[in-house]
């Protein structure tokens, strides 16, 4: 599905009955979480709350509440087509050398398409139709959700944060939650390994006493949001990739108060800065693990300016024990990851991040095993190849006769093909999600790899068991007279 911006996407969802307008008054304080959660768990539509008590803005939730809508946001019609996006990314990340003159020409359309999707810079953008400055800046006028009873304050959840490190031309996009502190202040919660935090660290080293410019987009088009969480190659900007997904170039405009660029069609933009050394305790908040996280200090984001479209839409979500919207997003992106992994490791048959494992903390991989120790190589590959798997705590590797998405198959393989001592790999002192309170040190913990493949000579001295299978001729013969047995 092709679309121009968030409003066009909403209109097309509504025409397909994939979005429901809620005219009954529903509060962003806890109530929207209950409604959104019930609808998501039933596989229901995206929701547009048009009657938000005490606020003038409608609230959009559950935009990516089904895999189908994630696929539509990526310009496709089904989850199956997401594999093609993964193949495109794999080709752009590590293009195969042409096999000849004819093959070189066949690769040109792909390269040309990527180059032609460079962002288009415009002035007079829709997102700057209205400007709040100085005393007009008031974040409390936005219908920011309070998602759970134990949350310390309202929380921006779909803020698309744009930063740029010193001496860099490329801007970084990331999605980081932001706690409301006051009318013009938020807390920017980003992990130290993420792009925005790395830009800020580099800025502090270069300009230790200068303010760090930041822009936050609320209500970007789906392709831009999804590009921010997809492993886009360093040779391609997230905005160019969003253009590829959307089928048209991303329109960007320069912020009024700094040199950063934001989507021209965004609903709301927050412009401001981080002051080196200015931090505040963030949390607790209920998060995607199903628990409240501990309180930690993060930088304070001072908002100098709010710009927005006519009648802006506030885009929000909640996070909690799966399934939630990030978990659904993870299921869809799983299909994008597979071709990327297979490009580098062709022996991988399937790769699965179970949503109940918080979408990234556990991975199951099936391979065509080729030599002793092969499973351990794949474990290391998963942990190191894509930064999205930096926080994956458990990797289970199975043979290709196992269905990676069927726990009965996986547990059977683990309990029949594993010796706990021989087939378990432990790696200590590795990067771990700060939200993982089970790790002994915040941000640092261990990883476990489990080799549930059949063992080859060199891995065992015993005769290995042969799986039981029925004779195919007998199966076909019985199936031929099955209907005559009077059995269902």
Curated annotation (Swiss-Prot):
Active site residues of this protein: 287 (proton donor)
Residues given in the record as Mn(2+) binding sites: 172, 238
Cofactor(s), names only, from the UniProt record: prenylated FMN; Mn(2+)
Pathway: Cofactor biosynthesis; ubiquinone biosynthesis
Residues annotated as binding prenylated FMN: 175-177, 189-191, 194-195
Assigned EC number: 4.1.1.98
GO cellular component: a single term: cytosol
Cofactor: how and how many bound: Binds 1 prenylated FMN per subunit.
Molecular function in Gene Ontology: 3-octaprenyl-4-hydroxybenzoate carboxy-lyase activity; metal ion binding
Keyword field: Cell membrane, Decarboxylase, Flavoprotein, FMN, Lyase, Manganese, Membrane, Metal-binding, Ubiquinone biosynthesis
InterPro entries assigned: UbiD, UbiD-like_C, UbiD-like_N, UbiD_bacteria, UbiD_Rift_dom
GO biological process: ubiquinone biosynthetic process
Bilayer topology: Peripheral membrane protein
Subcellular location per the Swiss-Prot or TrEMBL entry: Cell membrane
Main location: membrane
Catalytic activity, as annotated: a 4-hydroxy-3-(all-trans-polyprenyl)benzoate + H(+) = a 2-(all-trans-polyprenyl)phenol + CO2
Entry-linked HAMAP family: UbiD
Chain's role: Catalyzes the decarboxylation of 3-octaprenyl-4-hydroxy benzoate to 2-octaprenylphenol, an intermediate step in ubiquinone biosynthesis.
Subunit structure as annotated in this protein's UniProt entry: Homohexamer.
Family statement: Belongs to the UbiD family.
Protein name in the entry: 3-octaprenyl-4-hydroxybenzoate carboxy-lyase
Lineage, highest ranks first: Bacteria, Pseudomonadati, Pseudomonadota, Gammaproteobacteria, Legionellales
């Amino acid at each position: 599905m092709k679309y121009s911006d968030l409003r066009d996407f909403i209109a097309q969802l509504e025409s397909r009955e994939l979005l429901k307008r809620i005219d009954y008054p529903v509060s962003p304080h806890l109530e929207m979480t209950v409604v959104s959660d019930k609808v998501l768990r039933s596989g229901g539509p995206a929701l547009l709350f048009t009657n938000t008590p005490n606020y003038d803005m409608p609230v959009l939730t559950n935009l990516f509440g089904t895999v189908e809508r994630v696929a539509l946001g990526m310009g496709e019609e089904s989850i199956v087509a997401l594999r093609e996006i993964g193949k495109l990314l794999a080709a752009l990340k590590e293009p195969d050398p042409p096999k000849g003159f004819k093959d070189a020409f066949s690769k040109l359309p792909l390269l040309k398409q990527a180059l032609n999707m460079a962002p288009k810079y415009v002035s007079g953008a829709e997102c700057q139709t209205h400007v709040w400055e100085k005393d007009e800046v008031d974040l409390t006028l936005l219908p920011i959700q309070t998602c759970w009873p134990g949350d310390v304050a309202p929380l921006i959840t779909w803020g698309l944060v744009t930063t740029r490190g010193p001496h860099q031309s490329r801007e970084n996009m990331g999605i980081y939650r932001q706690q409301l502190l006051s009318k013009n202040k938020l807390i920017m919660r980003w992990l130290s390994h993420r792009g925005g935090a790395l830009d800020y660290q580099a800025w502090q080293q270069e300009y230790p006493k200068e303010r760090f410019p930041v822009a936050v987009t609320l209500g970007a088009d789906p392709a831009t949001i999804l590009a921010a969480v997809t492993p886009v190659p360093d040779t391609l900007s997230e905005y160019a990739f969003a253009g590829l997904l959307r089928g048209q170039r991303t329109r960007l405009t320069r912020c009024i108060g700094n040199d950063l660029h934001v989507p021209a069609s965004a609903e709301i933009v927050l412009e401001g800065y981080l002051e080196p050394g200015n931090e505040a305790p963030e949390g607790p908040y209920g998060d995607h693990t199903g628990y409240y996280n501990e309180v930690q200090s993060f930088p304070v984001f001072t908002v100098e300016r709010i710009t927005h479209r006519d009648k802006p839409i506030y885009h929000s979500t909640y996070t909690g024990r799966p399934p939630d919207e990030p978990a659904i997003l993870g299921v869809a992106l799983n299909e994008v990851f597979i071709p990327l992994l297979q490009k580098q490791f062709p022996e991988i048959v399937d790769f699965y991040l179970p949503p109940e494992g918080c979408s990234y903390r556990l991975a199951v991989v099936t391979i065509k095993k080729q030599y002793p120790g092969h499973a351990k190589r794949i474990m290391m590959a998963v942990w190191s190849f894509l930064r999205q798997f930096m926080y994956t705590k458990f990797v289970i590797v199975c043979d290709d006769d196992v269905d990676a998405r069927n726990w009965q198959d996986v547990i059977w393989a683990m309990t029949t093909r594993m010796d706990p001592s021989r087939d378990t790999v432990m790696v200590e002192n590795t990067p771990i999600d700060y939200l993982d309170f089970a790790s002994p040190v915040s941000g640092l913990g261990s990883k476990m790899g489990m080799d549930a493949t059949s063992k080859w000579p060199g891995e065992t001295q015993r005769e290995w068991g042969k799986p039981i299978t029925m004779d195919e001729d007998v199966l076909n013969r019985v199936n031929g007279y099955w209907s005559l047995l009077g059995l269902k």
